[in-house]
Amino acid sequence: MTSTRKSNPIMKMVNHAFIDLPTPSNISMWWNFGSLLATCLLLQIITGLFLAMHYSPDTSSAFSSIAHITRDVNYGWIIRYLHANGASMFFICLFLHVGRGLYYGSFLLLETWNIGILLLLTVMATAFMGYVLPWGQMSFWGATVITNLLSAIPYIGTDLVQWVWGGYSIDKPTLTRFFTIHFTLPFIIVALTTLHLLFLHETGSNNPCGIISNSDKIPFHPYYTTKDILGLTLLLLLLMMLVLFLPDLLSDPDNYTPANPLSTPPHIKPEWYFLFAYAILRSVPNKLGGVLALLLSILILMAMPMLHKSKQQSMTFRPLSQLMLWLLTTTLITLTWIGSQPVNQPFIMIGQMASMTYFTTILILMPLASLTENKLLKWT
């Protein structure tokens, strides 16, 4: 008799996706981040749902409703901090997941890669909307600065900003629509994640060697489910350490002051996971140029398949390309640090140099390193 998981229509889909899925036998812990991201998403949706039950999307009561959740709601403090720090964990896993894709050449699976970039942009939009909801000083001024970037668009910029705000300044309509969009986007992320998986399972996973592994595959369960549980345990351990011991480590103290349109904070900055893009935005003196650089800092990932000049898919056996990727990594860390600093020297100069290095590494140095390696291996 056929097993239920192979005969039941719904179970059959689950079986093909997570149980009997043929998986390369040599994929490392770097392939663990997909399941960790799914866990983070589930955690964010569950905690967000409970927070939404007590949150009030109104400028007069939003800040106090957050205080009410933290002080009065049963276990409200842990739900709130799980949601806030869960977002940080989400982005740590996202950046590592994208980094793994760059290192092992997973961007050559075009559909999967492009949907992944779309997912990254959607998650960033969701996180930005969520940062505005507590209606603290940094929420208000962060929203003001970022939404104002739309005014750089020629002809329609000002009208577009006022349309997003729902008035002539950030007020109640802005908060209401940001809450609505923040609530809706995670479900769109779930749909995109399903598409991401669908396209991945069409081609099969890449592997550390970057070679076809059809001749050596093993079922996903129990081998990789067990392996994923280890990664999940470490992720939850790190998250719970943050939530229980250092819940405000990654948040801004200014956000514990209610939003005041008449008082500007000394240094407006977004959450830590946006600082690299914020530093690139600030490094261009022209407003429109800065906005374009900001967009390109993420959208440049879409060009990776075209910039791939190596005869090998993975960087495992390409030391020059590895060096370029680590240069890119250190540049991103530098940009993150610069984004958190005030706008004065030497930070302006360091930010401009790091921004130039970021784009130069991706557009020029990485393809050049690949071509050099081809030449050295006489693969031209």
From Swiss-Prot:
The keyword Protein biosynthesis does not apply. GO terms for biological process: mitochondrial electron transport, ubiquinol to cytochrome c. It is found in: Mitochondrion inner membrane. The lineage of its organism: Eukaryota, Metazoa, Chordata, Craniata, Vertebrata. This is Cytochrome b. Binds 2 heme b groups non-covalently. Component of the ubiquinol-cytochrome c reductase complex (complex III or cytochrome b-c1 complex) that is part of the mitochondrial respiratory chain. The b-c1 complex mediates electron transfer from ubiquinol to cytochrome c. Contributes to the generation of a proton gradient across the mitochondrial membrane that is then used for ATP synthesis. A ubiquinone binds at residue 201. Keywords: Electron transport, Heme, Iron, Membrane, Metal-binding, Mitochondrion, Mitochondrion inner membrane, Respiratory chain, Transmembrane, Transmembrane helix, Transport, Ubiquinone.
